[in-house]
From Swiss-Prot:
PANTHER family listed in its UniProt record: PHOSPHOGLYCERATE KINASE, PHOSPHOGLYCERATE KINASE 1, CHLOROPLASTIC-RELATED
Pfam families listed in its UniProt record: PGK
EC number: 2.7.2.3
InterPro entries, sorted: Phosphoglycerate_kinase (IPR001576), Phosphoglycerate_kinase_CS (IPR015911), Phosphoglycerate_kinase_N (IPR015824), Phosphoglycerate_kinase_sf (IPR036043)
Keywords, in A-Z order: ATP-binding, Cytoplasm, Glycolysis, Kinase, Nucleotide-binding, Transferase
Protein name: Phosphoglycerate kinase
GO biological process assignments: gluconeogenesis; glycolytic process
Compartment annotation: Cytoplasm
Binding partners and assembly: Monomer.
SUPFAM superfamilies: Phosphoglycerate kinase
GO CC annotations on file: cytosol
Catalytic activity: (2R)-3-phosphoglycerate + ATP = (2R)-3-phospho-glyceroyl phosphate + ADP
Residues holding substrate: D26, L27, N28, R42, H65, L66, G67, R68, R119, R152
Length: 397
């Protein structure tokens, strides 16, 4: 999978000494109402790549997008200034913020500068060739260390990589590609995928793509309700998409023909209303009443999934199986999370809700790999080529 040049290999060979290195990181972090960084995982994740280049004697430029500013019109709220400050603390050295950097940056070997929000540059999102060439002229080596934006062809993720003298993957991107390759290109069997979420329509292409590859396709959340409808089960007033039932049936059929299966819940946790104080009732799947809402899988189904997961060779996890924000509907997701933690198989997890579940149950250390990319992770699961990765592969060929 990872047939790309890597920053680690260049650093090892001594090729970075005295060179100008341009790192595209993903520093798109959330802020609280007071304008302070509320969660800095992405900034911390960027440090190893920056250190690698620094220690190899390079002059280092780092940039990232932050939010969705209007091109050519950055406001104070769009500035990477707080990120520069946090990066300075993490690196133990001053990281200067450079505005208006496209036409030239002064940076010395052993120094790190942060180039202001790249989405402020006119032409960034359209992958403009003129802008890409200007940015490529700033460096000797371009490094992409931002898996979270790998599915977007933009000037700092794609265009610059076409024209920079050398283009490579940073350690974060390298690890991500390796883990994803291990999970989908050459997986240890059995391969189990968990796809949760509210809508079949938004994840249909992923479900179809996985139906050709996996041994067990576990569906959760609103998606599972649509699959229950497809299996002829009552779902009351649960969230579902009746218009997607045919597509769900087709996925079940593809799996069946391959001797694989979509385990349909045999029991569920219902409530008459949706909320933190809703009373939870466990019912057999066939007994769901017209005014019931299914908000979690039942204990019998959860145990069956746990058995499947514990025996798995590889697990791909995207999405919870119930409304785990409310404790009375969290049991299914907790059982699944703990089974993944206890499984001897290799697990890879991605997507915002999934990361929240991993944090809630404290199983980060027992998850094989936690993907930093939301949309990029999903597009990879769909089997789509990621433009930022494809260009690095082309440059390495």
């Amino acid at each position: 999978m990872s047939n790309v040049n890597t920053l680690s290999a260049l650093a090892k060979s001594g090729a970075l000494s005295g060179k100008r290195v341009f790192i595209r990181a993903d520093l798109n972090v959330p802020f609280d109402d007071a304008g302070r960084i509320s969660e800095d995982t992405r900034i911390r994740a960027s440090v190893p790549g920056i250190r690698l280049a620094l220690d190899a004697g390079a002059a280092v430029m780092v940039t990232s997008h932050l939010g969705r500013p209007k091109e050519g019109a950055l406001t104070e709220a769009d500035s990477l200034a707080p990120v520069a400050q946090r990066l300075s603390e993490l690196l133990g050295m001053q990281v200067r913020l450079v505005p208006d950097w496209v036409d030239g940056v002064s940076v010395e070997p052993g120094e790190v500068v942060l180039l202001e929000n790249c989405r402020g540059n006119v032409g960034e999102k359209k992958d403009d060739e003129g802008l890409s060439r200007k940015m490529a002229a700033l460096c000797d080596v371009y490094v992409n260390d931002a898996f979270g934006t790998a599915h977007r062809a933009e000037a700092t993720t794609h265009g610059i990589a076409r024209f920079a003298p050398v283009a490579c993957a940073g350690p974060l991107l390298e690890a991500e590609l390796e883990a994803l390759g291990r999970a989908l290109h050459d997986p240890k069997r059995s391969l189990v995928a968990i796809v949760g979420g509210s809508k079949v329509s938004t994840k249909l292409s992923i479900l179809q793509s996985l139906a050709d590859k996996v041994d067990q396709l576990v569906v959760g959340g609103g998606i599972a309700n649509t699959f229950m409808l497809a299996a002829g089960l009552p779902i009351g007033k649960s969230l579902a998409e009746p218009e997607q039932v045919e597509q769900a049936r087709a996925v079940i059929e593809i799996m069946k023909r391959r001797g694989a299966e979509v385990p349909i819940p045999t029991d569920v946790v219902c409530a008459k209303s949706f909320g933190a104080d809703a009373a939870a009732t466990v019912k057999a799947a066939a007994d769901v009443a017209e005014d019931d809402m299914i908000l979690d899988i039942g204990p019998q189904t959860a145990q069956r999934l746990a058995d499947i997961l514990k025996a798995a060779g590889t697990i791909v996890w995207n999405g919870p199986v119930g409304v785990f924000e409310f404790d009375q509907f969290a049991h299914g997701t907790e059982v699944v999370a703990r089974a993944i933690a206890d499984s001897a198989g290799f697990s890879i997890a991605g997507g915002g809700d999934t990361l929240a579940a991993i944090a809630k149950y404290g199983i980060a250390d027992q998850t094989g790999y936690i993907s930093t990319g939301g949309g990029a992770f999903l597009e990879f699961l769909e089997g789509k080529a990621l433009p930022a990765v494809a260009v690095l592969q082309a440059r390495a060929a």
